[in-house]
From Swiss-Prot:
It comes from Clostridium beijerinckii (strain ATCC 51743 / NCIMB 8052). It comes from the Bacteria. This is Histidinol-phosphate aminotransferase. The lineage of its organism: Bacteria, Bacillati, Bacillota, Clostridia, Eubacteriales. Keywords: Amino-acid biosynthesis, Aminotransferase, Histidine biosynthesis, Pyridoxal phosphate, Transferase. Pathway: Amino-acid biosynthesis; L-histidine biosynthesis; L-histidine from 5-phospho-alpha-D-ribose 1-diphosphate: step 7/9. Pfam families: Aminotran_1_2. Its EC number is 2.6.1.9.
Length: 358
């Protein structure tokens, strides 16, 4: 702590990312990264972008990438906003659409950056408690508020809300912005993008980090009514006009174009997920229904902390949350088939031997 910090810095509780230890080689199943690399076309596009033009600033409008996304979703370019990862877009959205005198609503067990941003920007907020099945109680999100944000599928639970239920939520909040954070939508759910033109209060946020294997580039995008997008651009251009570098723009554009590779790896991950769920259930885990690239599971006898610590000793990282209601759960990213086979093997060993120190 420094004497030069202002009160906000002293008070804020920052987001804590998944651990990335360097002490040994781990199988990383803790940060929901894609286990497969970007496509060859993406890597080639990025290599080609490493040239003398790096002396120049990148395109502040991200026009080529915007055009590619517009073609992909059949939208107008003024309905698309590009950001430095979906986290940046979420931060801009909190600044753009939510006011200090109106309470915003989001689930109590979801992406913890929502709470961080609300407190960082001094916003009034209410955490809506998930029900006993870890479902988001949508009726609670329909009461008077200053805006709503929910992840779909939810993280860390992986549970998905159908489009009809979300349409009802949006209709109940016609005078307020409803943000649907679709970071994991490509692994089983239906995007709300197709309903965008029905609702001028709907903002959909997606990322290239998960299904497009580009977590290292930090590129995300928002889709919504042109007036919402204009608001985001006003905030962006009041902070940093050049949020995406040239290499990232080239790689992201190629990733959107290479839909064949995208479809292949997402299907592969979903297939692996289905297999892993069955194997975990055989080991006496309770696994929540997931439409994401991870599963949320608790064991009927062993604690989440015990399993997490022993897996780490065995060279496997999973995400453990030391929080009320979910402290016995583990969030396990779906890796390659080979990685998940090793996970199941190690779990079988840990549980059968009741090892506390390995």
């Amino acid at each position: 702590m420094s004497k030069y910090w202002n009160d906000k810095v002293r008070e804020i509780e920052p987001y804590v990312p998944g651990e990335q230890p360097k002490d040994r080689k781990y199988i990383k199943l803790n940060t929901n990264e894609n286990p497969y690399p970007p496509s060859d076309k993406v890597l080639e596009a990025m290599r080609n972008a490493v040239n003398g033009d790096l002396k120049l600033y990148p395109d502040p409008t991200c026009s080529e990438l915007t055009s590619e996304i517009a073609n992909y979703y059949k939208l107008d370019e003024n309905e698309i906003f590009i950001g430095n990862g979906s986290d940046e877009i979420l931060a801009f959205s909190f600044m753009t659409f939510f006011s200090k005198n109106k309470k915003i609503l989001f689930p109590d067990i979801s992406y913890t950056f929502y709470k961080v941003y609300a407190e960082l920007f001094d916003l009034n907020y209410e955490l809506v408690k998930l029900d006993d099945n870890f479902d988001i109680p949508l009726e609670e999100l329909k009461k008077t508020n200053g805006g709503v944000i929910i992840p779909n599928p939810n993280a860390p639970t992986g549970k998905y809300i159908n489009t009809e239920s979300l349409k009802s939520l949006i209709e109940a909040n016609k005078d307020r912005v409803v943000i649907i954070d679709e970071a994991y939508i490509d692994f089983g759910g239906q995007s709300m993008v197709k309903y965008m033109h029905e609702y001028d209060n709907l903002l959909v946020i997606q990322t290239l980090s998960k299904s497009r294997s580009l977590a290292g580039l930090r590129v995300g995008f928002a889709l919504g009514h042109k007036d919402l997008i204009e608001g985001l651009n006003r905030i962006k251009n009041s902070i940093n006009s050049y949020t995406i570098d040239r290499v990232a723009l080239a790689g992201a554009k190629a990733a959107i174009q290479d839909s064949k590779y995208f479809e292949e790896i997402t299907k592969k991950i979903v297939k692996t997920r289905e297999k892993v769920v069955k194997e975990l259930e055989k080991l006496d885990f309770r696994v929540l229904k997931s439409e994401s690239n991870f599963v949320f599971a608790s064991h009927n006898n062993a604690s989440g902390k015990f399993i997490y610590e022993n897996l780490k000793c065995q060279g496997i990282l999973v995400r453990y949350f030391d929080k009320e209601r979910i402290d016995n759960f583990l969030r396990i990213t779906i890796g390659t088939n080979e990685e998940m086979d090793i996970l199941i093997e190690k779990l079988r060993f840990i549980l059968s031997n009741n090892q506390k120190e390995l």
